[in-house]
Every structure is written in structure tokens, then in C-alpha cells.
């Protein structure tokens, strides 16, 4: 619903419905309206409060009507709808037209040619002179007769135009908007976020929006206006609320790696799996999809992201976990050969004392690999061998130690590939190669039609067990590795 801040004789107009209601003169009167449920609709009471406070509230019910035709009132009185308010103000109407032209290539105009009503219409060109928009001359009648009625427009055009028109119709100081991205395709949602935050910045106003759209949020951040995100979750009877401050959000959006990885989209998922490369991301995503379709244990509502290598995985999982998103890392086993494992432990919020001990364990495991594999030419050769043989490259107590260490790491959402590297999964397919030269043949062998006898269904071991373990950590409300 949307209400004008103009009142007369103690009455206000609901700009969406066009109906009058009594405006409470004091806070106590407003309180009585809210508590007197059997006599006054609660929505009316909230609407009255919004009017007094210059609040623009656009909920799901009222927003659907914003592009509809409205009845006109005497032009020398206060406007009774957002259409009439814009019709009376050339500057606001011009801004509406420019906003819609930039968004979808058409100007939104207010057609006054239907007696007693105002309605929106669309045109490719503006009238020859501004006064034509507010006249009923033959030229005006001909112009509007050629315009396209808003009733013929898509729901996205109606929704976008209605919200912009409502926002511009009065000098609101607070905007309350429920799911502003409804009916909008991604680019339009981004443009709406950009427009709303710019308006808020110009007026020193505040936009409070509940959204499930990373595109809308990206548009808000793009405006340069201070944007703060509060991420709310409710799962297994546990509610959480985490704040992502404006400076941190801006930092995330400016980082090319995080921006290209789609980190902002992760805000709208229950969990994330961060992989070393796009090949890993595509493969593990397919494994998870098949688990969800044909078995149990897949990660529900999880997004799969890729870094550039395992060293940059820490740059992604840390900010996600700070936002309360359980972000698991799936990396190749050769991470154990590098001192940089400490960065991954820090990003996973492993306690410092524990991390210190694990750093020493890593060094011992590396020494064990060097002793048993006997690489010929140093670290590059050792890395190749470790990724080729996995944990099976160690025997006896060394094998027990590395398996226990991998289990310890998994408790903090760090999952190292026990077979060495992603290309070693599903050995029964007998695919040799690396990156895309491996991935494409693997997908072909796995099949795309579940009815085909050769289609690869989930099993109990190998990569299927690995992904189930990742999914279990993401789903566990008592998981380790998420800062309080």
C-alpha cells in the first residue's frame, strides 16, 4: 500500500485503493486503531502510521495494483492517487519517463483522456511539447490514441513502472518494499535496486527491502550508496540474523575474484561449496544433482562456486562464513604439501591452537609422502604423485594418520579429495585427461537420460560418499567453522 503525506480535514487518501480514511491525531489514537481489531483493519492502521511518518510501504498485495487505472479527483484538491500526483508534477513525471526509457526502452506516460480517470500508457517517443501531456486537445487525443495501454504490457513492465511511480509520487523518507524483484527479469531487478538506492541517497532516505534477488542487491551496491545486508535464516527451529556492514559489502563487490565467483548470490542459499576450478564446480554440482534426484544425502539448496585455485578458496569461504553461510571447500589432496594450508585453516575459523597443531601434522604427512613416494625432481613431481595415488600412497600408521587428519579437517568444512584430485573420481569410467579434456568425456560417459541403461546413478562409495559428507556438514546446525 502507498499513502500520500498530504491530508485535509483529518483525512488521508490511500493512493493504491483511492479510498479515504480518518487520520489519527495522536500516537495514542493510532495505538487504539491497531488494538481495536474488530473495528478497524490492521492494514488501515499501519497505513495511517506510514502516512504520518512519510513512509512508502509496498507489500505484495498493493504492489500488483500500482499500474492499474485510477479515478481522478478535482485537480485543485490533494491528489488521491500516485498517478494524479505525478500528473500534477512535471518534474516527477519527467523522471519517471526517463527511468522507464532507460530500463526497457519505452516512456511511461499518464493518459488523462478517459473522463474521470488516469491511466498509464507506453510510447516510444515523448509528446512534441510537455504541455501536450496535460491537455485534451485534438493533438493530445491523437497522441494518446497511438500509445500502448499499460494493460497490454508484461507483468515485469507493470511492476517496475508501478514501483518507480509510487516512489516518485511524494517525498517519502522511508521505503518498505517486500520482494521488489517480483515479476522482474534479472537486469530489470538490478536497475530497480540502482534506482531505489539513488533516490534514497538524494533524499537522505532509507530503503528497507526483503529480497531473494542477488541482482536487486547488486544494483543497490552499484549505486555507491551505503548498503547494509541483514541475512535472516530459520532452519530446524533455529533462527539467525547476521549483519554484513556496508563497508564489507562494498569490499566484496570490488574484489574481482569474489564478484566473478558469484559470492553475492550465495546470500540467498542455505550453503555453498567452493571448488578449485570451474571443472571441479561443474563436476561436483552434477554429482550433487544426481544425489538429490535419485538418492539421499545431497546438499539441499546449495550453490557451487569456483575459485582460481585452491589457494584462493580461502578468499571466498571466509567472507561467506562471516555472513553465516556454511561454505565448504572441496580441494585436491596436494594442499597438504604447502605451507599455505594455514591460510585455509584461518579462513575456516579453526581455533589457533588447533591450527598450530595441524600445521605440524601437515608437515609430517608431507615428509611421509616424500619418504614413501620418493619423488625424483622435488615439489612439482611430489605434487603430481600425490594427486595420482591419493591417500593410498601411504601405508601403515602413516595411512591411518592422514585419514584421521582428513576427517578432522572435514569437521571444519574443509574436504580434501582422498583419491588425490577430481580427475581420479569414478575410475570405472576409464577417462584420462585433465580439466575440460577430462570433464566433457566424463559427462558423456555418465549419460543424460536416466532411462538409458548406461546412465550413472549414485553409488555408496567414491565421489558419492565424498559429496554426502559435504552435504552433511552444510546441513548440520551445530557444524564447526562458522564464527558466532
Regions found by a protein language model. Name each.
Residues 1, 128-265, 463-465, 472-484:
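Switch/communication elements of ASCE P-loop NTPase nucleotide-binding domains
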Residues 1-81, 297-300:
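Electropositive, glycine-dotted interaction segments
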Residues 13, 75-76, 106-108, 260-274, ...:
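Acidic, Mg2+-coordinating catalytic modules of nucleic-acid enzymes
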Residues 18, 23-28, 33-35, 129-148, ...:
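Charged, glycine/proline-rich intrinsically disordered loops and linkers
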Residues 41, 45, 54-159, 165-169, ...:
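Extended helical coiled-coil dimerization/tether regions that scaffold
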Residues 78-83, 141-150, 182, 247-248, ...:
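Short, basic, glycine/proline-bearing loop/turn elements
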Residues 97, 193-197, 217, 317, ...:
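Short amphipathic alpha-helical segments and helix-helix/interface helices
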Amino acid at each position: 500500500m502507498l499513502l500520500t503525506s498530504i491530508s485535509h480535514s483529518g483525512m488521508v487518501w490511500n493512493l493504491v485503493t483511492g479510498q479515504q480514511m480518518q487520520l489519527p491525531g495522536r500516537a495514542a489514537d493510532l495505538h487504539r486503531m491497531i488494538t481495536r481489531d474488530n473495528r478497524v483493519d490492521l492494514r488501515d492502521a499501519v497505513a495511517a502510521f506510514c502516512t504520518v511518518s512519510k513512509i512508502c510501504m509496498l507489500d505484495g498485495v498493493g504492489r500488483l495494483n500500482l499500474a492499474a487505472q485510477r479515478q481522478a479527483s478535482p485537480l485543485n484538491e490533494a491528489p488521491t492517487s500516485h498517478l494524479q500526483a505525478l500528473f500534477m508534477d512535471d518534474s516527477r513525471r519527467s523522471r519517471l519517463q526517463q527511468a522507464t526509457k532507460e530500463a526497457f526502452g519505452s516512456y511511461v506516460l499518464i493518459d488523462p483522456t478517459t473522463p474521470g480517470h488516469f491511466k498509464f500508457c507506453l510510447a516510444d517517443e515523448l509528446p512534441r511539447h510537455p504541455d501536450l501531456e496535460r491537455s485534451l486537445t485534438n493533438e493530445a487525443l491523437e497522441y494518446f490514441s497511438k500509445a500502448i495501454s499499460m494493460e497490454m504490457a508484461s507483468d515485469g513492465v507493470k511492476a517496475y513502472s508501478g514501483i518507480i511511480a509510487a516512489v516518485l509520487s511524494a517525498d517519502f523518507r522511508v521505503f518498505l518494499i517486500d520482494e521488489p524483484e517480483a515479476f522482474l527479469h534479472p537486469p530489470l531487478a538490478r536497475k530497480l535496486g540502482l534506482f531505489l538506492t539513488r533516490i534514497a541517497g538524494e533524499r537522505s532516505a532509507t530503503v528497507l527491502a526483503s529480497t531473494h534477488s542477488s541482482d536487486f542487491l547488486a544494483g543497490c551496491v552499484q549505486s555507491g550508496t551505503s548498503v547494509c545486508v541483514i541475512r535472516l535464516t530459520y532452519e530446524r527451529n533455529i533462527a539467525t540474523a547476521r549483519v554484513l556492514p556496508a563497508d564489507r559489502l562494498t569490499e566484496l563487490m570490488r574484489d574481482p575474484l569474489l564478484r566473478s565467483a558469484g559470492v553475492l548470490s550465495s546470500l540467498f542459499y542455505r550453503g555453498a561449496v567452493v571448488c578449485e576450478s570451474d571443472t571441479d564446480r561443474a563436476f561436483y554440482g552434477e554429482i550433487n544433482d544426481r544425489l538429490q534426484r535419485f538418492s539421499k544425502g545431497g546438499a539441499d539448496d546449495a550453490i557451487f562456486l569456483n575459485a582460481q585455485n585452491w589457494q584462493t578458496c580461502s578468499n571466498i569461504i571466509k567472507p561467506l562464513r562471516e555472513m553465516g553461510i556454511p561454505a565448504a571447500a572441496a580441494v585436491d589432496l596436494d594442499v597438504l604439501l604447502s605451507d599455505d594450508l594455514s591460510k585455509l585453516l584461518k579462513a575456516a575459523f579453526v581455533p589457533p591452537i588447533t591450527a598450530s597443531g595441524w600445521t605440524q601434522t601437515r608437515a609430517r604427512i608431507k615428509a611421509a609422502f616424500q619418504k614413501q613416494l620418493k619423488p625424483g625432481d622435488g615439489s612439482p613431481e611430489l605434487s603430481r604423485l600425490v594427486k595420482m595415488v591419493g591417500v593410498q600412497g601411504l601405508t601403515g600408521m602413516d595411512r591411518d594418520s592422514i585419514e584421521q587428519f582428513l576427517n578432522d579437517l572435514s569437521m571444519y568444512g574443509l574436504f580434501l579429495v582422498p583419491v588425490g584430485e577430481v580427475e581420479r573420481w569414478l575410475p570405472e569410467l576409464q577417462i584420462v585427461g585433465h580439466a575440460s579434456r577430462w570433464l566433457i568425456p566424463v559427462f558423456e560417459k555418465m549419460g543424460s537420460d536416466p532411462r538409458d541403461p548406461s546412465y550413472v546413478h549414485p553409488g555408496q562409495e567414491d565421489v558419492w560418499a565424498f559429496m554426502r559428507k559435504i552435504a552433511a556438514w552444510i546441513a548440520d546446525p551445530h557444524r564447526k567453522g562458522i564464527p558466532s
